[in-house]
Regions:
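N-terminal signal-anchor transmembrane helix specifying type II single-pass membrane topology
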Residues: 2-23
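Conserved catalytic region of serine esterases and O-acyltransferases that act on ester linkages
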Residues: 251-374
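N-terminal module-boundary/linker segments of secreted carbohydrate-active enzymes
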Residues: 30-75
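Conserved SGNH/GDSL esterase-like catalytic core that processes O-acyl groups on lipids
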Residues: 63-157
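Alpha-helical cap/lid subdomain in secreted, periplasmic
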Residues: 124-267, 271
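Structured segments of extracytoplasmic/periplasmic soluble domains
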Residues: 63, 68-76, 142, 166-170, ...
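Signal peptide processing junction and immediate N-terminal pro/mature segment
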Residues: 20-33
């Protein structure tokens, strides 16, 4: 069995090496036109008057996170009003076009709202059920977390644009923020592979949004979609706390304890994880918090540290990534990212289910499919 596993690995490596030689230009753009440059995040204060938020998401944008965000907003005297279309495990396509091909666009009728009741997302965006809240100013939307699988099978670019167009029909001045989802941890005892993956995935998510922004609207005008870099921020948080064991509120915690502090399982968040993402999302949209004494159900030192680390991350992110565009994106994901993505998926999902050899056969088939079709 060990010999067969080694042979399987060798076959994958040889084939991948050949593919890299044959497709070295895969990430080179075929267009000579200069792409439009988009701001990653709003300028501080730009969104202050836009506080009515509609969220289209799944279990990574749960009610506890949004309630924390609402509590933070009230504490800094910038109260938000929100509602959501939440459908666990869903893609943007599921929440718009729908899963039933015979009922086009029935996906807008799926999912539950902030109260756990069924929702008609189109009707809600057109006329909010929140009393005296007015039109929704902001759409916060996320995708399934398996990035390349979502691009291929769920047509992220197509349905992100479709959802944006439906949203701005109800408010032409509405703003859209794409919330980057994080993938499952491959090993909770060693988060380094997950952190490395999320760092590699972030530029690909940016390319997805840039390409959507580059597409012409069917009608009218829309503000460019911005990005809430939740996945990268979460990876940065875990990496920072592991590397800095004296951090206030998290002192002397083991790497596994830090991971368990934020993750209920291998992907869903605890209260501390949701609080960090709430602080990150609020500050990504509205800028750094202007108050430090913010009540929370978390211990004060933990909550204060999480808010500060979210702010510090965003300050670095604004400096390092003030804008994004599709110039470096090419016609599809780079072969190096396809290799990294399929390796991570094989190790995290396929191998525990199928075994080493079958998982690597699947990985090679997936690599070919992504290279040909993305």
């Amino acid at each position: 069995m060990r010999r067969l596993a080694l042979l399987s690995t060798a076959v994958v490596v040889v084939c991948v090496t050949g593919l890299m030689v044959m497709t070295s230009a895969i990430s080179t753009s075929s267009s000579s036109e200069e792409p439009t440059v988009y701001p990653v995040l709003p300028a501080p204060g730009e969104m202050d008057a836009k506080r009515h938020i509609f969220v289209s998401g799944h279990s990574l944008t749960p009610r506890p996170m949004l309630e924390f965000m609402s509590q933070i907003s009230a504490a800094v005297e910038m109260p938000i009003v929100w509602n959501s279309q939440n459908l666990n495990g869903s893609s943007i396509k599921d929440r718009s076009f729908g899963r039933d091909e015979s009922r086009a666009w029935s996906g807008f009728d799926t999912g539950t709202d902030a109260n756990g009741e069924t929702i008609d997302a189109l009707a809600e965006m057109q006329s909010s059920s929140k009393a005296d809240a007015g039109k929704y100013d902001i759409l916060l939307i996320t995708e399934q977390h398996r990035l390349l699988d979502s691009l291929l099978w769920q047509q992220t670019e197509t349905y992100l644009r479709a959802y944006q167009e439906r949203f701005i029909q109800s408010n032409p001045e509405g703003e859209v923020f794409f919330f980057t989802p994080w993938i499952s941890l491959s090993d909770k005892n060693n988060a380094s592979d997950w952190i490395e993956y999320e760092r590699a995935a972030m530029p690909v998510w940016q390319c997805v949004v840039a390409k959507v922004n580059d597409q012409p609207l069917n009608q009218g005008h829309a503000h460019p979609i911005r990005i809430v870099p939740a996945s990268l921020a979460l990876a940065d948080l875990v990496g920072h706390l592991i590397a800095n064991p004296s951090t206030s509120g998290f002192a002397n915690e083991s790497p596994r304890k830090i991971v368990d502090t934020f993750f209920e399982d291998d992907v869903h968040l605890t209260a501390a994880g949701n609080y960090f993402i709430a602080a990150l999302t609020f500050q990504a949209i509205y800028g750094e918090l202007k108050a430090d004494d913010i009540p929370s159900s978390l211990a004060d030192d933990k909550a204060r540290t999480l808010r500060k680390l979210a702010a510090d991350f965003l300050a670095r992110y604004r400096t390092d990534n003030p804008t994004f565009d599709s110039k470096a994106c090419g016609d599809g994901p780079s072969l190096s990212f396809i290799f990294k993505y399929t390796s991570y998926i094989e190790r995290t999902y396929a191998r525990p289910e199928k075994g080493y050899v079958a998982a690597n056969v699947k990985r090679f088939r997936d690599m070919l499919r992504f290279m040909r079709q993305l």
